[in-house]
């Protein structure tokens, strides 16, 4: 495997060289807990990348939300293009957990919508940990939630080599055991299909498929192919196919688990009936016996994760398997924005436990469901071999446990921390409006943070009435829309972004020159020392960065944030004078922020249909045909087959129009190849097309 190697157009500068050296020395000397106290815009991610390069160890980078994790994933992919950089977050686009509300006698069934691309990336991440040592995984708090046993997942992989003798039926049975489904019509991730002596497998972690050609029981040839077009991409001497799901039920374990579940059911029924909970006992019996019947028939059931303790053969209260168990013992842990991430990790267990305890008490689940849970913080801590906590405002835990704090205050660009000014609240909106107009006239952007949703909505409406292009970012906005809003802000689609608690950590917005903090003197976590420092940091990437605090008194939190910002500004000024550095604003392409994020959570795009072909020239027809062909393939890839069929029909109409033009050479160059591709789209919808005869309609 290639070594972990950073590819960057610049070398470490400012405080980065000494920070890298201190962190590496700390790791080499065995320090378990280190903190990188880095100001906004000082290149903390670059520093961590250089540390990883020097220690050459598999690394887990944890962030506190999907958006920040996606941003880090994109950055590490750029820093380590030759290495395996994975992304592991919750794969739910929409998720409603199973719950029961006793006061309303309301049972809420679990509902989940899985994002296929994130699921693929999760498999890609875990498989990289079994096949490579040059691995960096960027994860959210999902890393501490239950996952299948790494032993079951890693040791059962199907390995095939060209030229070896393998019984085809046994290979197919192995694929079934690995949770692959046979589907000769709809070929997608986690399925395989058989055509004569040819077996095709679509791995759960891949965007391409494997084609295995056999002569009897001999593997004659293996190739990697495009699953849509069938185009051969590369020849393979050997392949390794990992399970299609992270939970792999073993036949022997399944039977033992079913026996244990029946025994637990009997015990819990006796307990409930002894307390006079007849309704709860009847409910539990009906639900559990139904699940057992499905499991005996199919080897799987909805909500099988609630029986994971029995499936994994764990004892009551035993630590569940998580992503952390997939790493080697000496892995490096990096926790980004640790002042938020650490409390989040600490709180996951209690929130999950409370909800499930209610389900158990009222007969919806067996007590063993409580062991389908995230790690307790003590359990998480036991997995930590060596950790680096990264934050501009480290929390209590970091200060209590650190063995070394490394400061990174100086920015390589010479940019100074923003000027902070406190203004009275009287007439604050009119004052803010004037400041916004001045900033908009210079082509920069503005962030405004409020304390309440009502105030944010009213302010957004008022600014729009005043002719200011304004958008409101709130907690109901999903990940994709949030990314779009941030991109539009950077592109100048609008100029002012108003929010509450969403304008703090991790937002990389170099175009923002003004941050306005309304009600800065109100007590609470939204105006705490760390919150104010983080909000101020949003203006630290612009050469004219300014922060306006609207308040009638200066609170201790405000005083600390202003003093700390002033201290950092003075340090940067001295450094700039000593080295003759002229501050320069950060210039970062918009794609740097958004492309990596949207890749991991992209919704199917809208497909454009063509105009009237009769009104087009020959050259225009060629362009439209090529464009429609690409859209048709993308629609089929997104399983939008109705749209693919519509585009196919339009392609047919285009080609008929083109046929009227007496240029046979051009006609053949366009018409021959696209027809073959159109057939592939038809084939992927599950309708065979043989020798010009169509069996079934799309």
Swiss-Prot record:
Residue ranges of domain Helicase ATP-binding in the record: 25-183
Positions with a binding annotation for ATP: 38-45
Sequence ranges assigned to domain UVR in this UniProt record: 622-657
RNA-binding among keywords: no
Location relative to the cell: Cytoplasm
Statement: the UniProt record of this protein carries the keyword Metal-binding: no
GO biological process: nucleotide-excision repair; SOS response
UniProt GO molecular function: ATP binding; ATP hydrolysis activity; DNA binding; excinuclease ABC activity; helicase activity
Alphabetical UniProt keywords: ATP-binding, Cytoplasm, DNA damage, DNA excision, DNA repair, Excision nuclease, Helicase, Hydrolase, Nucleotide-binding, SOS response
InterPro entries recorded: Helicase/UvrB_N (IPR006935), Helicase_ATP-bd (IPR014001), Helicase_C-like (IPR001650), P-loop_NTPase (IPR027417), UVR_dom (IPR001943), UVR_dom_sf (IPR036876), UvrB (IPR004807), UvrB_inter (IPR041471)
Domain Helicase C-terminal, first and last residues per copy: 428-594
Residue ranges of the motif Beta-hairpin: 91-114
Domain of life: Bacteria
Any one annotated GO CC term: excinuclease repair complex
Classification via Pfam families: Helicase_C, ResIII, UVR, UvrB, UvrB_inter
Family (UniProt): Belongs to the UvrB family.
Subunit structure: Forms a heterotetramer with UvrA during the search for lesions. Interacts with UvrC in an incision complex.
Function statement: The UvrABC repair system catalyzes the recognition and processing of DNA lesions. A damage recognition complex composed of 2 UvrA and 2 UvrB subunits scans DNA for abnormalities. Upon binding of the UvrA(2)B(2) complex to a putative damaged site, the DNA wraps around one UvrB monomer. DNA wrap is dependent on ATP binding by UvrB and probably causes local melting of the DNA helix, facilitating insertion of UvrB beta-hairpin between the DNA strands. Then UvrB probes one DNA strand for the presence of a lesion.
Entry's free-text remark on domains: The beta-hairpin motif is involved in DNA binding.
Protein name: UvrABC system protein B
């Amino acid at each position: 495997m290639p070594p972990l190697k950073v590819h960057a157009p610049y070398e470490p500068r400012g405080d980065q060289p000494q920070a890298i050296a201190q962190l590496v020395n700390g790791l080499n000397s065995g320090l378990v807990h280190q903190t990188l106290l880095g100001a906004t815009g000082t290149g903390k991610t670059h520093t961590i990348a250089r540390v990883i390069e020097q220690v050459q160890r598999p690394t887990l980078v944890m962030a506190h939300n999907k958006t920040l994790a996606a941003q880090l994933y994109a950055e590490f992919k750029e820093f380590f293009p030759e290495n395996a950089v994975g992304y592991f977050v919750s794969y739910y686009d929409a998720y409603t957990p199973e719950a029961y509300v006793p006061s309303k006698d309301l049972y809420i069934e679990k509902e989940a919508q899985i994002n296929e691309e994130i699921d693929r990336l999760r498999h890609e991440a875990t498989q990289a940990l079994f096949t490579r040592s040059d691995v960096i995984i960027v994860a959210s708090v999902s890393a501490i939630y239950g996952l299948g046993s790494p032993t079951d997942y890693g040791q059962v992989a199907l390995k095939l080599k060209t030229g070896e003798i393998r019984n085809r039926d046994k290979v197919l049975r192995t694929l079934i055991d690995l949770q692959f489904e046979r589907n000769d019509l709809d070929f997608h991730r986690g399925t395989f299909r058989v055509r004569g002596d040819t077996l095709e497998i679509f791995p759960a972690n891949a965007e391409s498929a494997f084609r295995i050609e056999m002569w009897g029981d001999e593997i004659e040839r293996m190739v990697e192919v495009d699953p849509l077009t069938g185009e051969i991409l590369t020849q393979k001497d050997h392949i390794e196919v990992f399970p299609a799901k992270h939970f792999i039920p073993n036949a022997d374990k399944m039977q033992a688990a079913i026996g244990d579940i029946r025994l637990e059911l009997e015990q819990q029924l006796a307990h409930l009936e002894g307390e006079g909970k007849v309704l709860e006992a009847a409910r539990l019996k009906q639900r559990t016996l139904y699940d057992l019947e499905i499991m005996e028939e199919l080897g799987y059931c909805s909500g099988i994760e609630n029986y994971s303790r029995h499936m994994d053969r764990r004892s009551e209260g035993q630590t569940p398997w998580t992503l952390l168990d997939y790493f080697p013992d000496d892995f490096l842990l990096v926790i980004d924005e640790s002042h938020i991430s650490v409390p989040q990790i600490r709180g996951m267990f209690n929130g999950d436990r409370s909800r499930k305890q209610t389900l158990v008490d009222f007969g919806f689940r067996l007590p063993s469901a409580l062991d389908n849970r995230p790690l307790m913080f003590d359990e998480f801590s036991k997995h930590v071999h060596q950790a680096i906590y990264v934050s501009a405002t480290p929390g209590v835990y970091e200060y209590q446990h650190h063995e070394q704090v490394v400061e990174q205050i100086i920015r390589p660009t010479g940019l100074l921390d923003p000027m902070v000014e406190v203004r009275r609240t009287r007439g604050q909106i009119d004052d803010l409006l004037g400041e916004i107009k001045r900033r908009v006239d210079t082509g920069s952007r503005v962030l405004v943070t409020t304390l309440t949703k009502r105030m944010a909505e009213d302010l957004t409406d008022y600014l729009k009435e005043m002719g200011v292009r304004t958008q409101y970012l709130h907690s109901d906005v999903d990940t994709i829309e949030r990314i779009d809003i941030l991109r539009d802000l950077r592109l100048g689609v609008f100029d002012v972004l108003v929010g509450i608690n969403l304008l703090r950590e991790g937002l990389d917005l170099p175009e923002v020159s003004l941050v306005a903090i309304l009600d800065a003197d109100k007590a609470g976590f939204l105006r705490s020392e760390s919150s104010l420092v983080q909000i101020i940091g949003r203006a630290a990437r612009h050469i004219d960065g300014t922060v306006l605090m609207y308040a009638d008194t200066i609170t201790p939190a405000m005083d600390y944030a202003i003093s700390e910002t002033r201290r950092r500004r003075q340090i940067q000024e001295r450094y700039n004078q000593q080295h003759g550095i002229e501050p320069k604003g950060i210039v970062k392409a918009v794609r740097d922020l958004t492309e990596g994020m949207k890749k991991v959570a992209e919704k199917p795009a809208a497909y454009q249909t063509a105009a009237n072909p009769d009104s087009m020239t020959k050259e225009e027809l060629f362009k439209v045909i090529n464009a429609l062909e690409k859209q048709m393939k993308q629609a089929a890839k997104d399983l939008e087959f109705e749209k693919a069929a519509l585009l196919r029909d339009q392609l047919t109409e285009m080609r008929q129009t083109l046929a009227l033009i007496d240029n046979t050479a051009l006609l053949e160059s366009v018409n021959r190849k696209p027809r073959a591709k159109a057939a592939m789209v038809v084939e992927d919808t599950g309708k065979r097309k043989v020798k010009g005869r169509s069996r079934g309609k799309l």
